[in-house]
Amino acid sequence: MYTGNQLRDMFLNFFASKGHRILPSASLIPKDDPTLLLTVAGMVPFKPYFMRKVEPPFPRATTSQKCVRTPDLEVVGKTARHHTFFEMLGNFSFGDYFKAEAIPWAWEFVTEVLKLPIDQLWITVHPEDEEAKNLWIEKTGVSPERIKYDPENLWAAGPVGPCGYCSEIYVDLGESRGCGKPDCALGCDCDRFLEIWNLVFMQYNRDEAGLLTPLPKQNIDTGMGLERIASVMQGAASNFDTDLFLPIINKVAELSGIPYHDSPKNDVAMKVVADHTRAVSFMLSDGIRPGSEGRGYVLRRILRRAIRYARLLGIDKPFLEQIFLIIQKDYSHHYPELKENENFILNHLRLEEKNFQATLEQGTQILQDKVKTLQEAGETMLSGADAFYLYETYGFPVELTEEMLIEQGMSVDMETFNAAAEEHRRLAKEQSQQMKAVQESAAISEKAKALGTTPFLGYHELAAHTKVEALFRDGEEVKDAAEGDEVLIFLRESPFYAESGGQISDSGVIRSLRAEAKLIEVKKGVTGTVYHRFLLTQGVLHTGDEVEALVDEHLRLATARHHSATHLLQAALRAVLGEHVQQAGSLVTPDRLRFDFTHFSALTSAELQRVEDLLNEAVLANMPVAAEEMSLDAAKASGATALFGEKYGDTVRVVSMGDYSLELCGGTHIRATGDIGLVKIISEGGIGAGLRRIEAVAGAEALKYMRSLNDQILDAAQLLKAQPSDLLKRIQGLLVQVKDLEKEVQQLNAKVAKSEVESLLQQVKDVEGVPVLAAKVSAQDMDTLRNTADLLKDKMKDGVLVLGAAVEGKVNWVTVVTPVGLRGLHAGQIIKEVAKITGGGGGGRPDMAQAGGKDAAKLGEALDQVPAIIKSHIK
């Protein structure tokens, strides 16, 4: 019996013998592919080769590619084959060989290497792909009766991009695995016939409209799921019963104290925990961090689902670390990133688990209260607003809300949830400012491909004589552009730095004999072509014009200071906090720097001061700054720091600052650290779980910042009539006075409330035998309003209180029902209806609830409605 590791090696070595280069798995983060959040298939890393956007460096390749897919998340663990993370074995041809070679090689591997019986194998082809059918018969000797047509045999990795007809190999697992129906055959929905290999004949490109156009060259892309073929070769009932999963499942069983195969329900939970923890481990190992959007949200959702199912097994203590160590042991020989990034993975697992346990407990309690309320009202659907409140306020995933409600025979109103979420996104989008992205039309893309890489002169020159190779306006190529036009320009070579690695693009101008244009932004495409966006400020510019390209030297130098300071900052952070610190993002501009990094607690004042001291000591040392190109292997051997999760080419640029800092970097820098001048940290804070952010200023901007602080101190001293040296003592004295005055105000408010109580008690009305007091009171905040309610409650003993207070045009509401459950009355339900009249909402417990309203003008109207509202709720 072959192990999963042996099967992986057998596949790769077989295709190496056929002239394929064995490549390591690409990252789960697709490179330069905005159409995909995650790597979902083996061919994804090779899409630029299939599309010929980049010339393939080799004609053939074979990989075992890490993949993550989540559309079928809810059925993972309930079927034999569905997973979130899986390994896709594949062989690829980039315009080299095609069907005539791919088909017999696949047959050779399946029948001669794996030695699967021919009489158990079946083939499918597309009805319009007679060529493939004939090749199966001619090249392998497969009987025509064992080849079936399948109109679904058209494959693609996404909605747009390379695609083609495909041919699939199935294995018949035997009648014992089937449905037992007399007509059970290939195509039946049962588990008898298992697809083990998909051969994709990549011939077309599908666009946004669904139109297919032939690719420049024909390609081969095949995919064999390692987990599936392992289940076949090991005679396992499911993928989960192979050696790829059993060690993980056995650990889950050990932690839960429940044997595997104890019950179908527990088995599903164990499989979910094993599958999801494996997926999370690999996603973290590639630098994906848990977050609230994009692939970070996918990771967090999978992780939280694992924790939820572990709790169903009785595992209520942290466990993810123990499961990860099993995964690391079994997989790190082929995926060393699981070992190399162990600290990063474990830190995030611990933090996410800790945070979600608290979220789960809090959110579950709130949801249970809402379920109880629904049950009491005879309803089965939770409002989308309530579900969004759980998600937005407590981070409680709506998917988890849905699952927990399904267990209670209930559901979520997803239409109103999505509406609330969309409104939230709309508001967030309005509040954010995003840089205008380069919009590539097909014509622009083709031109970029034809021009290829744009030589960058800006490391050594800030002015260059170059030529306008092409002009585009509104996505269309034009021969000339006039004053006022905004255009995209391709230059023969460029001194302008293209936005990359967190450093913003250069500013500057180009000048010809007849025109001048101001640079707006610079970006680099996947082909290495540099896109320049200019605004024509004078004259007419033509394609073919010779121009002078001039970088804004002042802004370039200011940016370089901040970029070099960022390198020193990372080195200082690692020295003070530890080697676990890794860059998670950055922004480098002429006036500031922003550095995001991994660390799991706020920096103390002493740590922050030490980091700043080390930074400026490195500046004062005036160390030389040098850049050198070398192979990626040589850079790694030198100990150069790389951006975690980033995929680099074979040749990289390494920037050194004396013996203090060594990083892979393509940005621009000063010549010596002394050129930075001064670095001042202006803020440090958290931006997410396990992520911190430091903002700092350097050079002239640091001086400007320090002057501003000094001016504020002098202004404050003058305002408080104190010397700057006495300012702190003066402020402390004022704070004591303010605290004393606030105490006096509270005491006065309490006296006012007490004096109001007696007169308010005279307003109590009888509503079908229930004492009801609905009144407007003069409370300036919610605390005072609650105190007034408490005083009235003590006096009334039993009944209902509904108190409203107008504060700056809005309304605060408090409702009390005493004793709890009086005549079936629920304070939260009452206040919800009352507050609605004033344009607000709220809720709370059966005995006490509070709410807000937007329109104080309707306070009286709302109070008038209280008796009728209470009457409608009396049971």
From Swiss-Prot:
Known catalytic reactions: tRNA(Ala) + L-alanine + ATP = L-alanyl-tRNA(Ala) + AMP + diphosphate
Binding site for Zn(2+): 563, 567, 665, 669
Chief location category: cytoplasm
Keywords recorded for this protein, A-Z: Aminoacyl-tRNA synthetase, ATP-binding, Cytoplasm, Ligase, Metal-binding, Nucleotide-binding, Protein biosynthesis, RNA-binding, tRNA-binding, Zinc
Details of cofactor binding: Binds 1 zinc ion per subunit.
GO BP annotations listed: alanyl-tRNA aminoacylation
Keyword Cytoplasm annotated: yes
Keyword Metal-binding: yes
Alphabetized PROSITE patterns for the sequence: AA_TRNA_LIGASE_II_ALA
Cofactor: Zn(2+)
Subcellular location: Cytoplasm
Enzyme's top EC category: ligase
GO MF entry, a single one: transferase activity
A single cellular component GO annotation: cytosol
EC number: 6.1.1.7
Pfam families in the cross-refs: DHHA1 (PF02272), tRNA-synt_2c (PF01411), tRNA_SAD (PF07973)
PANTHER family given in the database record: ALANINE--TRNA LIGASE, CYTOPLASMIC, ALANYL-TRNA SYNTHETASE
UniProt family annotation: Belongs to the class-II aminoacyl-tRNA synthetase family.
Domain notes: Consists of three domains; the N-terminal catalytic domain, the editing domain and the C-terminal C-Ala domain. The editing domain removes incorrectly charged amino acids, while the C-Ala domain, along with tRNA(Ala), serves as a bridge to cooperatively bring together the editing and aminoacylation centers thus stimulating deacylation of misacylated tRNAs.
Stated role: Catalyzes the attachment of alanine to tRNA(Ala) in a two-step reaction: alanine is first activated by ATP to form Ala-AMP and then transferred to the acceptor end of tRNA(Ala). Also edits incorrectly charged Ser-tRNA(Ala) and Gly-tRNA(Ala) via its editing domain.
Official protein name in the record: Alanine--tRNA ligase
UniProt source species: Desulfitobacterium hafniense (strain Y51)
Upper taxonomic lineage: Bacteria, Bacillati, Bacillota, Clostridia, Eubacteriales
